[in-house]
Amino acid sequence: MPERGRVSVPVGPAGVEAGGGVTAFVVRAVALLCALMTERSSVAELAGILREEVDRYSPGERLPSSRRLVERYRVSPVTVSRALAQLAAEGVVVTRPGAGAYRAEPSGPATPAPGDTSWQEVALSAQTAAGPVPRSVDASGVLVTLAEPPPGVIEFNGGYLHPSLQPERALAAALARAGRRPGAWNRPPTDGLPELRSWFAREIAGPGGEGGPTGADVLITAGGQSALTTALRALAPPGAPVLVESPTYPGMLAVARAAGQRPVPVPVDADGLRPELFAAALRATGARVLVCQPLFQNPTGAVLARERRREVVRIAREAGAFVVEDDFARSLAHEDAGALPPPLAADDPDGVVVHLRSLTKITSPSLRVGALAARGPVLERLRAIHVVDQFFVPRPLQEAALELVGSPAWPRHLRAVAAALRPRRDHLAAELRRQVPALAQAAAPRGGFHLWVRAPEGTDEAALTGAALRAGVAVTPGRPYFCAEPPAVHLRLGFAATAGTAEITEGVRRLRTACAEALPHGAGGGEPVPA
């Protein structure tokens, strides 16, 4: 290896080459620059050679001295010193002042990639019950999002739009126009107003409309929760297993349990429901119903990946099972959501999918108007359950809904909400990273009302949510979102029910105080980070 890094240029008192002038000074500067570039190249080259040679030595064994390396590779001492420093920074060697360089001791065994234990959620819940499944009515998971927080408490647990985001003027105008319609207070058709059924059918079918439901396939319901209750009662008898996403909306679990059904979890990842575990759950339980939220799933915000969409419907069709598609968040897309995938029901000629949606989330908690869409004989069973449960949805509400969605204010409202939710989402995510980095976030969803965060291992969920409420911020515990043992402690943090970004900042500050009290020691949950 030729000698590099040594350049000798005699310099006179004036800083130029002895006996020269400006030309000699330029020559010297160029020579120095070339020397610097050559030196850097030599360091990298020597480090590469030594990196291979060090494997010949045992851990802890001394390498040749710097002098020997200078002689062997014909480089400068500076080059040797820098190459060894680079290898020390990489953990290949250890340098000891005055004693030389040694091969580094091997580090501990690499941490193996975590295994995937998601299948256990299916296995632990798949056993056939020895007797009838007891009916249980537990509304605690639902009441968390419905209860009014105490005065002064910031609402991170809300499931509806803040009043400032609701279309109050448009709703008032729609109600006024609806009240003037002929027969507004007469009894409506039990299936719903034909015009409203047709509007929902067009929304489900999307542009083009081929392959989607028609108005005759739609039933008007008193909101999404009512539609879900009707669907589960119609599709699964008491004692039957019902496949659900894990985690999932507590209100759905409450409906299934109240009907005496047995929820069986199918895990969700970043791309939505996992088809292979869905198929495994069908085989293990004999279930004939899956309830899923393919778009901005509650609580994870996941969107069912394109390649999984057809797979889920195919698996269900081959098993003779129904897919209940809860499309609650289609109107809750954020400004940066891009083009949304169509509903599963938009291309379902075989009637596998029972679709439900609602106007409530995008308007007001009190506009409880939704829809069920299905094809084939199942529609008759849905209709029968629907009539027995509620007769019909009050006509003034249906008329008001028609007036609202048919007004110029409707598309403006959708755009306004999309524009308002994105900065709230981004601000909450940023404040959590800044103030409470111990709460791990997945990728922020581009639709819906909330973030799903994981607390450090060892966190007491009840203690954390209690501490948050004492600090002045209401958060939603994650445990009610699982029908089997949860894999970790989670919180659902909403941003749509807040007044704006300033309130979000204050809410996270209060949550940081709660984390300092309730997170395991050393979790780093309560340390303020400068803005």
Predicted stretch roles:
Residues 353-435, 442-443:
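PLP-dependent aminotransferase class I/II
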Residues 182-319, 331-347, 421, 523, ...:
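Conserved core of the PLP fold type I
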Residues 1-176, 383, 387, 393, ...:
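N-terminal basic, amphipathic alpha-helical segments
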Residues 373, 452-454, 494-496:
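Short hydrophobic/aromatic beta-strand micro-patches
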Residues 338-360, 380-381, 491:
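Conserved active-site segment immediately N-terminal to the catalytic lysine
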